[in-house]
């Protein structure tokens, strides 16, 4: 392995540590959550369509997603390791016999449909993804609960300190009156 491949592998591992992408192939319907910056505000926009191609390799790997928007075909190419991609969800598995589905560009309506894959591989991948998503949601929920508890404890400590300060101030105000 030469130096460039080694550096690319390290970068890919670093990006995969932050977010993991599910296993998907051409023919699968995917929902890509993309970060969109409008002025100073950044939001996440979902782009859902059929993956018609995967190309490249290593850090330069990308995939093409096609959808029909208002009767017009729209294709978008996403680099797999782009920081603008927040997540990719597989909506359904497609059963195709080609690696590149460019023939869908010429088709409309029912002829452009892709049969859903209900085989063992698809079920296994879907079950694994559902388990991973459920685990991720549970982890996020646990973090939220821990943060809420820490915030409540911090607020209670601040309220107790405030009450103590008020009691000391009242005691100090009562002392000169007693003299």
Curated annotation (Swiss-Prot):
Gene Ontology process terms (BP): translation
Keyword terms: Ribonucleoprotein, Ribosomal protein
GO cellular component, one term: cytosolic large ribosomal subunit
Coiled coil regions in record: none
Listed InterPro entries: Ribosomal_bL19, Ribosomal_bL19_CS, Ribosomal_bL19_sf, Translation_prot_SH3-like_sf
Pfam families reported for this sequence: Ribosomal_L19
GO molecular function: structural constituent of ribosome
Disulfide links within the chain: none
Assigned protein family: Belongs to the bacterial ribosomal protein bL19 family.
Role description: This protein is located at the 30S-50S ribosomal subunit interface and may play a role in the structure and function of the aminoacyl-tRNA binding site.
Name of this chain's protein: Large ribosomal subunit protein bL19
Organism from which the protein derives: Rhizobium johnstonii (strain DSM 114642 / LMG 32736 / 3841) (Rhizobium leguminosarum bv. viciae)
Lineage: Bacteria, Pseudomonadati, Pseudomonadota, Alphaproteobacteria, Hyphomicrobiales
């Amino acid at each position: 392995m030469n130096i460039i491949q080694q550096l690319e592998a390290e970068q890919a591992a670093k990006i995969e540590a932050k977010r993991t992408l599910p296993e998907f192939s051409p023919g699968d319907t995917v929902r890509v959550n993309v970060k969109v910056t409008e002025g100073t505000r950044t939001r996440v926009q979902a782009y859902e369509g059929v993956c018609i191609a995967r190309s490249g390799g290593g850090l330069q790997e990308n995939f093409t997603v096609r959808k029909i928007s208002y009767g017009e075909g729209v294709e978008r190419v996403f680099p797999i390791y782009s920081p603008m991609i927040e997540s990719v969800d597989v909506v359904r598995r497609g059963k195709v016999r080609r690696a590149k589905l460019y023939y869908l560009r010429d088709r409309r309506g029912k002829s452009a449909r892709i049969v859903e894959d209900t085989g063992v591989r698809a079920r296994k991948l879907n079950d694994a993804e559902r388990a991973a998503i459920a685990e991720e949601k549970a982890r996020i929920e646990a973090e939220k609960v821990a943060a809420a508890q820490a915030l409540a404890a911090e607020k209670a400590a601040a309220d107790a300190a405030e009450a103590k300060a008020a009691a000391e101030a009242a005691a100090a105000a009562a002392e000169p009156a007693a003299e």
